[in-house]
Amino acid sequence: MFPAVLAAGVFLTALADSTRGRIACAVYTLTACLLFGVSALYHRGDWGPRAHAVLRRLDHANIFLIIAGTYTPLTILLLPGSHSAPLLWGVWGAAVLGIAFRVFWVGAPRWLYTPCYIAMGWAAVFYLPDFLREGGIAVLVCVVVGGLLYSAGGVVYGIKRPNPSPRWFGFHEVFHSLTLAAFAVHYVGISLVAYQHA
């Protein structure tokens, strides 16, 4: 998955026509590569206890990064400065706090940190009219559908249900499937925004 995400991110960054757009898309690409790269290492490697603990912290912390990274091109390319600055500062500030929380309390219960991911992800609800006005219905649908898929994944992760086949395709695989679908939908939306503003 990591090579595909990297290639898609490079394409997206090249699609943006302005310096601001390229920087915003590069930030999104970097956070996506960190998420998928670290997740692949964490889940596929046979690590000792110490390396496993470090990778687990990074894996969980990267969720906050991808949320803020996803907001970055949408906010910079779609919102006026009076709206974009508060949203960007808010989500990146929340990301820093969330990362510190997950790094220093890696054993926190799911019921405590999963709602933090979901709440941070839905900060955009106050800006949906702006996204519709500046991006159009297709972009708005991508933002909302991606958010719903991420939220569904968060709920599955939090309650560990459904768990159809624990050995082969359990709740964790359902969670990852939903988040992959959410990422793909958001990527399409961000690509539409970058293309519109190219």
Model-identified regions with their sequence ranges:
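Multi-pass alpha-helical transmembrane bundles in non-GPCR membrane proteins
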Residues: 1-198
